[in-house]
Amino acid sequence: PDGSMKASSRVAPVAGETLERIDALLSRLGNPVGVSAYKPYHSSGEDFLHSFLGMIGIPIELTPQFREDAPVVFLNESARFDPTIVARIDKQLRAGKSIVITTGLLKALQGKGIEQIVDLEVSDRRVLTRSFSNLWGGVWEADRDILLPQVRYATNDSWEEITALAAEN
């Protein structure tokens, strides 16, 4: 009757007030930095992996452009849709920068030139485990079993940072 609007939801005004308070702090946070993650347009493979990494606290900057200026680029299986991805990986590494790839991408690039860059191969074997070690400082246990692909490599040419332990090894 007095012409004033009544909030139709108690959630929206509270959220608005909270966001206004946060706005006052944003200028003091600095420049957030995340790991550049390249996902070409219209690509798929290992879907939602970037989101899962973000949920465990790894800041991901997902982009459809391959960031040559990034010190580290994360690539999952979706990068296979870029026909120049092996050349991009090679160029990035030769520039002294780091590339992190998943076993999904490694398997997708087998026979397409990746073997000229790294002497690793994803086999068809899997291991179901919950035990892990860094080989130098103990064993850690996950809450549940995790199914992992086996990656073959020549010992002393490559070393894993973390190894999965099973009864067979």
Question: What spans do the regions from the language model cover?
Answer:
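Generic structural signal for beta-strand residues in well-ordered domains
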Residues: 28-30, 66, 92
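Hydrophobic targeting/anchoring helices
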Residues: 1-59, 163
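Short secondary-structure capping/turn micro-motifs that flank functional sites
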Residues: 4, 68-70, 108-109
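Hydrophobic beta-strand segments of well-ordered beta-sheets in folded domains
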Residues: 1, 32-37, 71-75, 95-100
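A conserved amphipathic helix/loop scaffold
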Residues: 64, 76-169
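A short, well-structured beta->alpha microelement
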Residues: 49-71, 77-80
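Short low-complexity, flexible loop/linker segments enriched in glycine and/or proline
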Residues: 6-17, 72-78, 113-118
